[in-house]
């Protein structure tokens, strides 16, 4: 997976994510929408109870891993199913393309989430930190991306 973005004054203005395994190119430009292989994409309108939750967790921080699984279990009780893929950029694109309804990870570097976060927003989704606060792209952050504000 390859992910790239362009920031202007702390705001992502262009985001691109390429999945070579499925030959999918996701991209978005602020104010212009989100696309996959040239087709416009949108988040799903499924409620969480009928939806899929995606999450990530770092294998390098066992305390963070424990908190991630506790949160995953809490979301699993509300959702239809849950998955962990290992790629923040692709998980964010899955939200944008309507393949899942919610994604979270407790600590990511900006290069892991910046491009995908714009793609989600331009597809109609919402991206914040885990506490619902705006993302600061200059530093590591938690991520909560969803198909709509809950």
Language-model segments: residues:
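Acidic beta-strand-loop-alpha-helix segment within the catalytic core
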Residues: 5-92, 133-135, 139-150
